[in-house]
């Protein structure tokens, strides 16, 4: 790859006043660093070389006023070509350019432009015109600048439109996200309320069960004294025992009446001399003496007296 330094020595040797001629130098690339070191070189001739592209840092040579890039093989200019704001004269004759960068509209000082012999886009070619003389090249510069400004404005509007679309899409996404978050909050709130209600019911059920447990001992305690005090005599066996004793007492009473009647007959009537009454009187006397000492009779008499 050929550079100016290897073909023609130091670039300063080629500097003539403010003009640096690097034409016909068989250059494949531009020595940007060396050119940046020569800010006095406001006129730069790079025509008739083998340049296919310009490096992006070439746009930092803002001191350039006149630039000749004719008869190279340039297919496009750097996107930041508009940074060369001091450029007044630009020759792009006989290259392979189809379009110009939008930043070209920033070359507000451009007065002269030649775009002949490039495979330009039809619209751009019509705007540029033929550029056959000085006047037409000046008109070319003016018309191309106006055209590129219009292209820039269109692109800016399109950019703004896309930004607006993106903003609207972002708003929709944010609104959707907010709605989703609100829905999730509402769901969590509902679940929390349901959980709270469930815990409340469990708590109420637990309290009710506890109250029931507390009532049972009280009920049993209330029932126990009544049973002991006899206010509610609900003892079937005692009733059966009482009825049995009543029958027994009745039989004993009848027996006593019968015996008493017989005893009376044997003791106070004329029958007491009869052998049977004599035996009865003897048995009676013995029975009375024994019964007086017997505990059963005392218990019967005591029970009878209590009732």
From Swiss-Prot:
Compositional bias (Basic and acidic residues): 154-221
GO molecular-function terms, A-Z: cadherin binding; RNA binding
Gene Ontology annotations for the cellular component aspect, listed alphabetically: cytoplasm; endoplasmic reticulum; endoplasmic reticulum membrane; membrane; mitochondrial nucleoid; nuclear envelope
Region (Disordered): 150-241
Single GO BP term: intracellular signal transduction
LRR repeats: 10-31, 40-62, 63-84, 86-107, 109-128
Positions in coiled-coil regions: 148-216
Compartments it resides in: Microsome membrane; Endoplasmic reticulum membrane; Nucleus envelope
Segments on the Cytoplasmic side according to the record's topology features: 1-244
Positions carrying N6-acetyllysine: 135
Post-translational modification N-acetylthreonine, affected residues: 2
Tissue: Widely expressed.
Sequence intervals crossing the membrane: 245-265
Compositionally skewed regions (Basic residues) per UniProt: 229-241
Primary residence: membrane
Membrane-topology descriptor: Single-pass type II membrane protein
Residues with N6-succinyllysine modification: 73
Record-linked PANTHER family: LEUCINE-RICH REPEAT-CONTAINING PROTEIN 18-LIKE, PTHR48051
Quaternary assembly: Can form homodimers. Interacts with SGO1. Interacts with FGF1.
Protein name: Leucine-rich repeat-containing protein 59
Lineage: Eukaryota, Metazoa, Chordata, Craniata, Vertebrata
